[in-house]
């Protein structure tokens, strides 16, 4: 535990184009080696591709995709009397968002398209249609939680 008390969580500023904090977090997660300009370019180009391919507004598709990827339950290892149990837990809102973004980008990076903006656009479109690797990751997490429902009383 920290000796100097609780550290306040820094708030992110909304992005300049869509005025959304979630988009800013998404851009920050895309960013590598502090190159925010490159990350913004990738994100906004992906959003343009989404608007062209789907015919819907890009932010709408993005929010729908995020809702389809963010997990409601996860399992945490808890050691009780020499045995380790996978205990299902509800996921806090902040962590839901973080996991959703992380899974989305991991799935996008594994895709086969040549450009990163195309990969991100493809994964977001798939996720908005409830398909794709990121949605599968969420379903697997929920299945794990469901399978270990018997240990739910070990919650802490």
Curated annotation (Swiss-Prot):
UniProt protein name: Small ribosomal subunit protein uS7
Under the heading Gene3D superfamilies, the entry gives:
Ribosomal protein S7 domain
Q: What InterPro entries is this protein classified in?
A: Ribosomal_uS7, Ribosomal_uS7_bac/org-type, Ribosomal_uS7_CS, Ribosomal_uS7_dom, Ribosomal_uS7_dom_sf
Q: Which GO terms describe its biological process?
A: translation
The GO molecular function terms of this record are: rRNA binding; structural constituent of ribosome; tRNA binding
| Keywords assigned | Ribonucleoprotein, Ribosomal protein, RNA-binding, rRNA-binding, tRNA-binding
Q: Which organism is it from?
A: Clostridium botulinum (strain Eklund 17B / Type B)
Which top-rank group of organisms is this from?
Answer: Bacteria
GO CC annotations, alphabetized: small ribosomal subunit
* PROSITE patterns the record matches: RIBOSOMAL_S7
User: Ribonucleoprotein: present as a keyword of the record?
Assistant: yes
User: What family is it from?
Assistant: Belongs to the universal ribosomal protein uS7 family.
Q: Subunit arrangement?
A: Part of the 30S ribosomal subunit. Contacts proteins S9 and S11.
Summarizing the function annotation, the protein's role is: One of the primary rRNA binding proteins, it binds directly to 16S rRNA where it nucleates assembly of the head domain of the 30S subunit. Is located at the subunit interface close to the decoding center, probably blocks exit of the E-site tRNA.
Gene behind the chain: rpsG
């Amino acid at each position: 535990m920290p000796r100097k008390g609780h550290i306040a969580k820094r708030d992110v500023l909304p992005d300049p184009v869509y005025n959304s904090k979630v988009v800013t977090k998404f851009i920050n997660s895309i960013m590598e080696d502090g190159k925010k300009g490159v990350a913004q370019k990738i994100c906004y180009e992906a959003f343009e591709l989404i608007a062209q391919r789907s015919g819907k507004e890009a932010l709408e598709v993005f929010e729908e995709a995020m809702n389809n990827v963010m997990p409601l339950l996860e399992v945490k290892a808890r050691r009780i009397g020499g045995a380790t149990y996978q205990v299902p837990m509800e996921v806090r809102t902040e962590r839901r968002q973080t996991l959703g973004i992380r899974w989305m980008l991991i799935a996008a990076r594994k895709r086969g398209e040549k450009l990163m903006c195309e990969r991100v656009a493809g994964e977001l479109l798939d996720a908005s249609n409830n398909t794709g690797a990121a949605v599968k990751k969420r379903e697997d997490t929920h299945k794990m939680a469901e399978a270990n429902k018997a240990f739910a009383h070990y919650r802490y």
